[in-house]
Amino acid sequence: MRTTTCFLSNIHQYLSIKRLIPNAREMLLSPPSSSLFEQYYSKINLFANNDIEINNNEWEKAVEVLRTPLPVSFRWNSAIDFQDKVGNQKHQGKRQLLENNISYKQLQFVDAWELNVDARALQNDIDKKKAFRWIVAQTRSGVISRQEVASMIPVSLLNIEKNHRVLDLCASPGSKTRQALEKLCNTIAIKSDDLGIVVANDVNLKRSFIIANRCNVLGLHTQRLCVTNHKAQSFPNISIKASTNKNEGAAIVDGQYDRIVCDVPCSGDGTLRKDPIIWQRWHPEFSQKLHPLRKFPILFSPEIN
């Protein structure tokens, strides 16, 4: 039933795209062509260099990267309770990838793999079906988390410790939230009395549910997760207990977060690598309309730190 539902959903999505863009199928199978996106960015001196030739060369390199399909990447679960499963599946994963003629690169700053294949090829190539099914199975079990490499960087740099209070202000779809929660729980047992917590916020209620669902695979570790539904610009400065130690009293501190993640809404230009149809639909207003939404959460975040 699930397979049938997914199949029908994909057909519906394709037909919807087909109605909007007559050559949708051809666009999916061929490299993107010149577009308003390229015209706009090539004229605004994006690289701020007085040498026109250098600017043109840099722009050509940027477009070349954007036209390159985004490699599949995933992060290994770092929560302490998953370490045995992770160790076992790393051996299984290496074997599955080798059998399907797929190579991988171990990232240096986080325990994650980047494959030499993009998502569309991985899913549609018959010779890679076993590797695809293995990735799906390990994602559902919580052993790995599908996440773009760029998305892994912020939390990796925060040096989150077991007693930290972390706020993810614009959290949906929850990949960074889950990464932060795993970092919080990678050196302590589930029943520890430490007060570390991740507060994940999103303005959209449905997206807040997505965050909770994404972290659900972590089981009891989610007792350290609080999902909220507020505007980032006016997130309440909540009070948190400073300690549960009776000898230290019951001091209360206001909004004293040790780490804040603020991944504000973006133009989505990078998704060109995943969805070539965007090349034809892109418009400068997409980014311009988001400017106020990006500005205010960044200005507001220090006030609740």
Q: Predicted segment positions?
A:
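S-adenosylmethionine
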Residues: M1-N305
